[in-house]
C-alpha cells in the first residue's frame, strides 16, 4: 500500500523524537530582500510534533530506513517497525507549507543511514538546496551530520545550514564498539573537528569580507545517551569538558536512555529512564559553561557519580565549606559565582552595585539571589550568616537544610509522606526523636529520587 505524505510525516516525526539536540537558533541572521522567513536569535517557535506538542522546529527524519544496527536505536536495521522515506522535494514542500501556515519558523533535519552516509547526506543536501535556492527560505535550519560523511559533502552542508551537529551517542569507544559496531570514534570526531575548523575560518573571513558565505553560523552541538552503557558521571563530564574546549561546541545534550527493545547488551525493558541523572548532568554542564567550574572540581575518581539529593553546585559548596562564608561586598567575582543561590546575572549585579554602597539581604533579594540557599554561605551588611557549625556535623546539618530548609530552621512543620507511627516506632526502639524524623525523611527523599 502506497504511503501518503501524512503517513510519512507521522512515522518520521515519531522516529525523530529521541533526538534531543535541538534548541533555539542562537543565530541573528535577518531576512534579505527576495527571501522567505528569517532567523532570530531568541529562537524559533510554533512547531508541532506528531503527538501535538508545540516545539520550536519541524523535527523530522529524512528516512528511518537504516543500514546501521546500533543496539540503542529504535530505527536500527534489525528492528521491526514501520519504515518511510521522504523524497527531497516532498520534504522541502512540506516545510514551506508549514512555514506559510505559521506552524514553524525552522527545520530540524536528521536521518537514518540510507545505504551509505554519503548517499544520505546528498539527499539531505537536496532538501536544503531546494529550500535555500528554489524556495528562498531564510529561516533556521539545523542539520544532523551523518558519521562517516565525506569532508566535501559536510562542507556543503555547513554552508546551507545554520547549525550542524554530530551525535557522540555513547561516552566511550568501548561502548561504541559494543553497541554501535557500524560507527567508529574517528567517524564522529573527524567531522566535529572539521566543523570547528571551518566555522573558525568562516568567522575570520567575515572580518575581511562582510558578504562572505557563513559556515554553520549558529555553531555545532552533540548528544550523549545516559544509562545505556556503564560509564560514570565523571567520565561523561570529562568528555563534555574536552569537547567544549577542543571543538567549541555550543551545547552538549543528554538523553536518558529509554529501553526500546530486548537486548542483553542493554538495560532491561522495565528499566526506568535515569531522568534524575540526566538532570544532574545538565546542571553540571551549566557549571562548566557559565560558572567557571572544571569537571575535576565537580566530580573525581573517588566520587564519580552525582549526589542524588543535592545539585552539583550545592554539593561542591558543602564539600568545600571551609571556603565559606564569603562577604558579598568583598568577594571576587569568581567566588560569587560559586555561592549556591547566586547565578551569573545576580553576581554581575552584586559586582556593580557594591561599588556604590554596602549590600544587605534586601538588596540581594531584589537582585535575584536565592536566599533560601545562599544564606548558609554568605555574610553581608546586617547579616552574619545562618551557619550550622564546622566539621562533619556542620556539613550534615547544612546538607539537610538544603534538601529541606524546614529541617534546619524549624520555623514550620513539614508534612510527612509517611504515617506518624513510623516515627513513633523508631523512637520506641531507642532512636532519638531528631534522628527518627531524619531517617523517615531520608526514606522519603530516596523514594522521590527513585520515582524520578
Residues of each region from the PLM?
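Conserved Radical SAM active-site core
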Residues: 1-68, 72-222, 226-230, 243, ...
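Long, highly charged, low-complexity intrinsically disordered interaction regions
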Residues: 265-337, 373-422, 451
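Residue-level signature of tetratricopeptide-repeat
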Residues: 353-354
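Flexible, acidic/Gly-rich N-terminal and inter-domain linker regions that tether
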Residues: 1-65, 370, 378, 386, ...
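A structural motif corresponding to the C-terminal lobe/cap of the Radical SAM core domain
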Residues: 177, 189-196, 227-235, 241, ...
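Long C-terminal interaction/binding lobes of large macromolecular proteins
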Residues: 1, 214-216, 234-245, 275-277, ...
Amino acid at each position: 500500500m502506497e504511503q501518503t505524505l501524512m503517513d510519512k510525516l507521522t512515522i518520521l516525526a515519531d522516529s525523530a523524537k529521541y533526538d534531543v539536540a535541538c534548541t533555539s537558533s542562537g543565530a541573528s541572521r535577518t531576512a534579505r530582500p527576495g527571501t522567505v522567513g528569517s532567523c532570530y536569535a531568541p529562537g524559533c517557535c510554533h512547531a508541532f510534533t506528531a503527538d501535538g506538542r508545540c516545539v520550536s522546529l519541524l523535527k523530522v527524519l529524512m528516512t528511518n530506513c537504516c543500514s546501521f544496527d546500533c543496539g540503542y536505536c529504535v530505527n536500527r536495521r534489525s528492528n521491526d517497525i514501520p519504515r518511510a522515506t521522504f523524497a527531497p522535494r516532498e520534504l522541502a514542500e512540506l516545510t514551506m507549507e508549514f512555514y506559510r501556515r505559521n506552524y514553524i519558523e525552522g527545520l530540524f533535519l536528521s536521518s537514518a543511514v540510507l545505504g551509505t552516509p554519503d548517499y544520505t547526506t546528498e539527499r539531505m543536501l537536496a532538501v536544503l538546496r531546494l529550500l535555500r535556492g528554489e524556495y528562498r527560505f531564510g529561516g533556521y535550519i539545523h542539520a544532523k551530520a551523518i558519521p562517516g560523511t565525506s569532508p566535501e559533502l559536510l562542507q556543503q552542508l555547513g554552508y546551507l545550514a545554520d547549525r550542524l551537529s554530530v551525535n557522540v551517542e555513547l561516552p566511550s569507544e568501548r561502548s561504541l564498539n559494543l553497541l554501535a559496531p557500524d560507527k567508529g570514534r574517528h567517524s564522529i570526531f573527524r567531522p566535529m573537528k572539521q566543523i570547528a575548523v571551518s566555522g573558525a575560518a568562516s568567522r575570520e573571513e567575515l572580518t575581511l569580507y562582510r558578504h562572505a558565505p557563513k559556515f554553520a553560523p549558529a555553531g555545532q552541538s552533540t548528544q550523549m545517551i545516559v544509562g545505556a552503557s556503564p560509564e560514570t558521571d565523571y567520565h561523561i563530564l570529562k568528555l563534555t569538558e574536552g569537547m567544549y574546549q577542543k571543538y567549541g561546541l555550543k551545547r552538549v545534550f543528554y538523553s536518558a536512555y529509554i529501553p526500546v527493545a530486548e537486548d542483553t547488551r542493554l538495560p532491561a525493558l522495565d528499566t526506568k529512564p535515569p531522568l534524575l541523572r540526566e538532570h544532574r548532568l545538565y546542571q553540571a554542564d551549566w557549571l562548566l559553561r557559565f560558572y567557571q567550574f572544571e569537571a575535576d572540581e565537580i566530580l573525581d575518581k573517588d566520587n564519580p557519580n552525582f549526589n542524588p539529593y543535592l545539585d552539583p553546585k550545592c554539593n561542591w559548596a558543602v564539600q568545600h565549606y571551609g571556603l565559606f562564608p564569603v562577604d558579598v561586598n568583598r568577594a571576587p567575582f569568581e567566588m560569587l559565582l560559586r555561592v549556591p543561590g547566586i547565578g551569573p546575572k545576580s553576581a554581575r549585579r552584586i559586582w556593580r552595585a557594591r561599588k556604590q554602597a554596602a549590600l544587605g539581604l534586601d538588596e540581594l533579594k531584589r537582585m535575584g539571589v536565592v536566599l533560601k540557599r545562599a544564606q548558609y554561605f554568605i555574610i553581608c551588611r546586617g547579616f552574619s550568616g545562618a551557619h550550622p557549625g564546622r566539621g562533619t556535623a556542620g556539613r550534615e546539618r547544612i546538607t539537610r537544610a538544603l534538601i529541606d530548609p524546614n529541617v534546619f530552621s524549624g520555623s514550620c512543620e513539614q508534612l510527612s509522606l509517611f504515617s506518624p507511627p513510623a516515627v513513633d516506632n523508631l523512637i520506641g526502639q531507642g532512636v532519638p526523636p531528631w534522628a527518627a524524623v531524619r531517617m523517615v525523611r531520608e526514606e522519603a527523599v530516596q523514594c522521590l529520587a527513585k520515582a524520578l
